[in-house]
C-alpha cells in the first residue's frame, strides 16, 4: 500500500501512515490543531480530517454507511453531497469521501449545526460515545 508501512507481530498487524507520522499533528481537534497536511494549516480547521478516514473492513463500512443515513441535514453540512454520491470514496467502501478538501463528515467551523465530525456531534446528541459512531482510525 502506497504511503503505509505495515509491521506484523504475530497475529497483530500494525499499520502506519507515513504522511501522518511526518505531519505537524497535535491531538486536540479544534484547539490549535495544525492538521496533518505536509505544511501546518490550522486556518483550514480540518484537523486530522484532511484525507478522510480509512475504514477497518466491511463491518466498519456498513456501520458508517448506516449511521450516515441517520444524520439529519441540520447536523451534517455535506448531507446533500452524501445523498447524491454517498459517503465512501469509491465502490470498495474502504475510505470516506473527500468533499472540499476534507472528509465528507467534517462540518466546517462556520456550519450552524456544529463544527467537527458530524458523526461525533450526532453521537453526543443522543447520549452515546463518539467512539461507537466514528471510524476507528479517527479515535485510536
Q: Where are the regions a protein language model picked out?
A:
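Hydrophobic scaffolds flanking metal-cofactor catalytic centers in soluble metalloenzymes
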Residues: 1-140
